[in-house]
Amino acid sequence: MCSDGSEYSFYSRDGDSDVAVLFFNGGGACWNDFTCTVENSSSTGAYWQNPTGWGGILDLDNRNNPLIDASMVFVPYCTGDVHMGNATLSYGDNVMHHRGYPNAMSAFDYFISSHPNASTYYVLGSSGGAIAAGFYAGSLSEEIPEANIFVFHDSTGGVTSTGTTDLYPAWGLNNTSFTWLDGLTYNGSSLDWNDMTSAHLDIFLNMYDPDITYGRFDSAQDETMKYFNGLLNNPPEDYNWRLRNSELHIESEGVEMSGWIESGDNHGILFSSWFYQLEDESVSFSDWFTSWLNGEMPEDVWCTDC
């Protein structure tokens, strides 16, 4: 179910290789009267997110697409809860069905039942879907312990919750189940949605399965994420710093990560034609990403004048 009560659906294609991709799409997020009553793209049905004709790794007519032969399940986003909620709340006259978790689980269950023996699993996400990618990658590792898993976060590297918003009742997070997190602690605490950076999720995921491969992409001045970070009581001007600090934090815990930070204010690359156009000092993003897909862990590409 989408946040407006409309029926939810996801998209699937069978490829010609033994590689399987689980892609979580993004959109807006909301958690209170203000954010859930302003116009929000995630409050509309899933039908409009049909990825046919999109760019990046979703462009199935482009032979330069490094995942063109892969099987894929595309998980649309229409619930305002980064694919993680399981609650229905009223905001004034507006009723929001935050049902991202059961929606995503329907796609996830189909994915693992349809591709139980893939040689490599890529769990990818853009925007809000980039947060979900880490959680469902852990569930994939739990379901298929021998799986070769790669996780890529597109455009959420600087997001930080500060405790100013209690996301548990807002999204019904206690009504979800990610049992791979059971018993895991970092600095004496379990993973806490109300006090979490993007680094924490990958650190916990690496504790559970140290064989997972990680990558990320961000824009230093991402206006969308600066806006949402501001709603979480973070100074928007700090976003570029948070991106870098997040990856450094991850790597300080022994987790190897390939990261790209570009200088602009764009939001999301995996679904965009920009995927094939971006270069930095003669390094092509599509070539860099392909190298990451091949397990080569390319060096970080971080903008210096941004």
Feature roles, as predicted:
Residues 1-306:
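C-terminal His-loop and adjacent cap/lid subdomain of alpha/beta-hydrolase
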